């Protein structure tokens, strides 16, 4: 190869090495984002729950509940920086055959989040149950590269963010996950009018404070930020004017089903694979290939520099050259003879 071939290989190898460095530092952060077309349904179950039967205005115990949460991305409302989710949650009484009566609670939510940090952002007509509301903190996912620290996590029922504290690292569904816990201390979330008899009052209608408390535990795959398992110990009660709990609206320990955990684990593995491709596999391949090209190029350049052409032979001159004294062939030398008449005759012969 010519020297220029080696130089081209060195340049190409250098370019690949630069690409190997830039991919995890520049390219990956630009591509690793929360997807706009998010679509998932998670199912949680609770055993032996207590709920308020609004038909009979009495508590029912030993009830099995199922909660369905559907998350759908509003692609048109999202962009490079934000994703918008529409969320619906419905809790039903498994034992109630009448579909219209089996519903225990229902809620809707619309939230916009930063596609890189997963933090809520003020945008896009966000609301809770149709009423405009500004979210804060994390909502339905954790950030890529979740750390062992405390995050602010939004509670839709309390309508504020609470500290979700890192507790431990565990194994779940074949994944290493971070366990976070957050506590919603008892808080009044509304006031409603109810029959006085419900609160033990003789009045026909009374005001009742609706109170809420929750202990939420989340198991998060740290690379992807996917919540592999969620669990809530939720309590809602009605209180009378003295602040005493009179009746339970819901008292349940809801947790992701095994199937939902497997579904979430698969989503985490898929996301982690894409992240690993951009942050590890591609940089390593580019770096090694670039290094090989540089080494080959340097070798070719050095070899070409050492193999300079020999000096061209000088063409023989057409004219004969005189022999050096040492090279002359010995020839017989004739001794000069003295002219007749001796020396004087010789002298006379000169003009």
Language-model-derived ranges and their functions:
Residues 139-231:
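Membrane-proximal low-complexity regions enriched in glycine and acidic/polar residues
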Residues 2-5, 274-325:
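Juxtamembrane interface at the cytosolic side of transmembrane helices
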Residues 92-98, 186-197, 208, 237-244:
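Short, cysteine-centered beta-strand-loop-beta hairpins and adjacent loop/turn segments enriched
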Residues 46-48, 183-187, 235:
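Solvent-exposed coil/turn segments that connect beta secondary-structure elements
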Residues 2-148, 254-279, 299-304:
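Extracellular or lumenal secretory-pathway regions
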């Amino acid at each position: 190869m010519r020297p220029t071939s080696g130089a081209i290989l060195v340049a190409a190898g250098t370019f690949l090495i630069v690409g190997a460095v830039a991919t995890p530092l520049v390219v990956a952060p630009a591509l690793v984002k929360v997807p706009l077309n998010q679509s998932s349904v998670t199912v949680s179950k609770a055993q032996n729950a207590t709920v308020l039967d609004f038909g009979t205005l009495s508590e029912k115990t030993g009830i099995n509940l199922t909660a369905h949460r559907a998350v759908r991305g509003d692609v048109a409302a999202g962009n490079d920086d934000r994703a918008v989710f529409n969320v619906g949650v419905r809790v039903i009484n498994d034992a109630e055959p009448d579909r219209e009566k089996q519903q225990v609670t229902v809620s809707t939510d619309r939230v916009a989040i930063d596609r890189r940090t997963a933090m809520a952002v003020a945008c896009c007509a966000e609301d809770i149950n149709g009423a405009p509301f500004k979210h804060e903190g994390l909502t339905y996912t954790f950030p890529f590269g979740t750390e062992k620290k405390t995050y602010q996590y939004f509670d839709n029922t309390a309508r504020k963010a609470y500290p979700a504290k890192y507790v431990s690292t565990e194994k779940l569904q074949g994944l290493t996950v971070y366990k976070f816990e957050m506590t919603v201390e008892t808080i009044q979330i509304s006031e409603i009018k109810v029959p006085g008899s419900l609160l033990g009052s003789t009045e026909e209608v009374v005001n009742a404070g609706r109170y809420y408390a929750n202990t939420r535990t989340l198991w998060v795959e740290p690379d992807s930020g996917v919540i592999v398992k969620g669990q809530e110990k939720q309590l809602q009660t009605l209180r009378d004017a003295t602040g005493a709990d009179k009746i339970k609206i819901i008292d349940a320990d809801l947790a992701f089903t095994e199937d939902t955990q497997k579904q979430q684990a698969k989503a985490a593995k898929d996301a982690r694979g894409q992240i690993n491709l951009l942050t590890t596999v591609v940089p390593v391949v580019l770096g090694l290939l670039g290094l090989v090209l540089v080494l080959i190029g340097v070798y070719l350049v050095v070899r070409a520099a050492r193999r300079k052409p020999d000096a061209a032979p000088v063409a023989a001159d057409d004219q004969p050259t005189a022999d050096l004294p040492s090279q002359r062939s010995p020839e017989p030398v004739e001794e000069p003879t003295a002219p007749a008449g001796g020396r004087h005759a010789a002298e006379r012969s000169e003009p």
